[in-house]
C-alpha cells in the first residue's frame, strides 16, 4: 500500500510539474505563438498576441498583450495593446461566456460585414480605444473612447449585440463627416431600436446636448435637442445641408433649441440664430404637427441674392397648416412686416396685413422670366388681404427699357398675386402713387395708378403722371384670358407729341 501511495504521489507531483510547466510556457512568446496558431488553424478566425499573463494576485483575470483578432481573409476587427479577460465559474458550463473583457489602447472596427465574435461577456469595457465603422450607414470614427457595454453578446453585423446598456465617452468623434469632441453617450440597444438617454458633445466651437430614439423602422424621435454657440461652416448648399433629413422615414422633433449660433455655406448663411421648435414631424418632403410652434430670430440671413437683416419669425403648426403670427425683417434698406396663414389643403398663402416701407430695391435682371415661371407645388395661391407701401424706391436696370420709381406709396385689399402657381394680379384692388419716376429716360412727376381685378379683367381706372408742363392720363382694361386683349384710352394735356416715342 505504501508503494501505491508513493506512486500516486509521484504521479500527482509529475502532473503538477507538467501543469505548472505548461502554465509558465503559455506565458512565454513560444506559448503565445502556439495558442495563436492553434486558434487560427482550427477556426475561421485569425488571432495573434505576444504574451499571455496570469497573476495569482488576480487569479480570475487573464491578460493578453498586443492582440490582433478578426475573421479569416478580412481586415482585423480588433487590434489592442492589452486585452484583460475576467473569468468566472460560468466557464464550467459556458467556456466562451466570460465575466468581463477589457480592451485597452487599440482599435475596434464596427461594420455590417463584421463577423460575430465567438465569445461574449457580461460586460465589455473600453479604455482609450478607437472605434471605426467603415462602409456602414453611420460613418463613424472615434478616438480616446472609454466606457462599457452590458451585457455584450455580439452577433453578425452587430458588434454591440441585440440588447445592451451603453455608456461611452470619446475625446473626439466624427459622424457622417461632422466632427465633435468631448462626446458622452448613455443609452441602450433593444434589437433594432436605439435609445439615447443622454447625448452631449462639443462641436463647431459650441455645445450639443439631447435625448433621442431610433425606432426599428429607421425613424427618429428627438425628445430634446439643444445647440449652443455653434459656429459651423459647410461646403454644401442649403438643400444638400438638409438632405439627410429626407433620407430617414421620419424625424419627430419634440423640442429643438438653438441659441446664439451661426451657420454658413457656399451661398447661404445665418448669424446669431436663436430658434425654438416644438412638436414637428418631418416625413420625406412633407411635415405633420399637432400644436407645433416655431420662434426664430437672427442678426442676418443670406440665401443667394436674398439678404435679410434682423428677421423675426413666429409661427404655429397644425394639421390644417401654418399660422404665421409674425414675420418682420429689414430688407434692401427698408422694413417688411406681415402675418397670415398657409392652408395645407388648398396650398394657399393668405397674408392678413403686409407692410413694406423704405425699400431701395433693384429688380433682378431675369425678373420677367421669374414672373412667368410656375411657382412650387406648395404655393398654389397668394392673397394679400391688406397691403400698404411707404417711401419705397424700385429700379429696373434693363437696358432696353430702364425705369425707376421714387418714394412709392400704396395700399390695397384682397390682392390675389398668385393663382394656380402663376404670378399675376388675379383679383382685388390697389392704389399706387409716387413722388417721381423715370421710364426709359423720360422723367415724370407724381405718377399714380388705381386698379381693380377680377377673374376676367384687370381694370385700370386711373393712370396719370405729370411730365414737363403737362399731364398724361389714361384708363385701360386687360383681359385675364390667355389672349390678353387690351384696351387703352390715353389723354395728354400740355405735353410734347413725341413724349411716347421713348416708351415704344
Task: Please describe what each predicted stretch is.
Residues 1-15:
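N-terminal Sec-pathway targeting helices
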Residues 61, 66-68, 123-130, 160-203, ...:
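Small-residue helix/turn framework positions
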Residues 85, 110, 140, 144-150, ...:
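Broad, structure-driven detector of short, well-ordered beta-strand segments within folded domains
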Residues 107-146:
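Non-cytosolic head/periplasmic domains of membrane-anchored proteins
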Residues 132-145, 264-282, 396-417:
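Short, solvent-exposed loop/hinge segments that bridge or flank secondary-structure elements
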